[in-house]
From Swiss-Prot:
<feature type="modified residue" description="Phosphoserine">
    <location>
        <position position="109"/>
    </location>
</feature>
<keyword id="KW-0597">Phosphoprotein</keyword>
<keyword id="KW-0732">Signal</keyword>
<dbReference type="Pfam" id="PF15807">
    <property type="entry name" value="MAP17"/>
</dbReference>
<dbReference type="InterPro" id="IPR031627">
    <property type="entry name" value="PDZK1IP1/SMIM24"/>
</dbReference>
<feature type="compositionally biased region" description="Acidic residues">
    <location>
        <begin position="102"/>
        <end position="111"/>
    </location>
</feature>
<feature type="modified residue" description="Phosphoserine">
    <location>
        <position position="110"/>
    </location>
</feature>
<protein>
    <recommendedName>
        <fullName>Small integral membrane protein 24</fullName>
    </recommendedName>
</protein>
<keyword id="KW-0472">Membrane</keyword>
<feature type="signal peptide">
    <location>
        <begin position="1"/>
        <end position="20"/>
    </location>
</feature>
<dbReference type="GO" id="GO:0016020">
    <property type="term" value="C:membrane"/>
</dbReference>
<feature type="transmembrane region" description="Helical">
    <location>
        <begin position="31"/>
        <end position="51"/>
    </location>
</feature>
<comment type="similarity">
    <text>Belongs to the PDZK1-interacting protein 1/SMIM24 family.</text>
</comment>
<keyword id="KW-1133">Transmembrane helix</keyword>
<keyword id="KW-0812">Transmembrane</keyword>
<feature type="region of interest" description="Disordered">
    <location>
        <begin position="71"/>
        <end position="120"/>
    </location>
</feature>
Length: 120
């Protein structure tokens, strides 16, 4: 019976009817409410970004080691071989590579100029 009495006492304390507050005369302007909403939203996004950064963070030593490995591999691969150097010298001796698209445009423009210079 003691527990039943305690439950009834707690029920009457927590389930008492709520009284409405008096309406305050002071209300915020609409632009201030919007500004507060935007600031609140940006604050929530900031907190979520911090949580994401902490949650998904990796160890710095691992990142630096992987970067060092990649740079080392890239430096080894970036050194041109002797065959590549010889081929480049041959292309330079021949006068370089030609841009066929540019030559085609030059030919078309010369055809148009001929059409303009015809006498009537």
């Amino acid at each position: 019976m003691d527990t039943l009495g305690r439950l009834l006492l707690l029920a009457t304390l927590f389930l008492t009817p709520a009284e409405a507050q008096q309406a305050s005369e002071r209300r915020l302007k609409p632009w201030l409410v919007g500004l507060a909403a935007v600031v609140g939203f940006l604050f929530i996004v900031f907190i979520l970004m911090l949580a994401n950064r902490v949650w998904c963070a990796k160890g710095r030593a691992e990142d630096e080691e992987a970067t060092f490995r990649m740079e080392h591999i890239m430096n080894e691969n970036s050194q041109p071989s002797k065959a590549d150097k010889k081929q480049k010298k041959k292309v330079d001796r021949k006068g370089g590579q030609s841009n066929e698209a540019l030559e085609l445009e030059e030919k078309e423009s010369s055809d148009e100029e001929r059409g303009k210079k015809t006498a009537l």
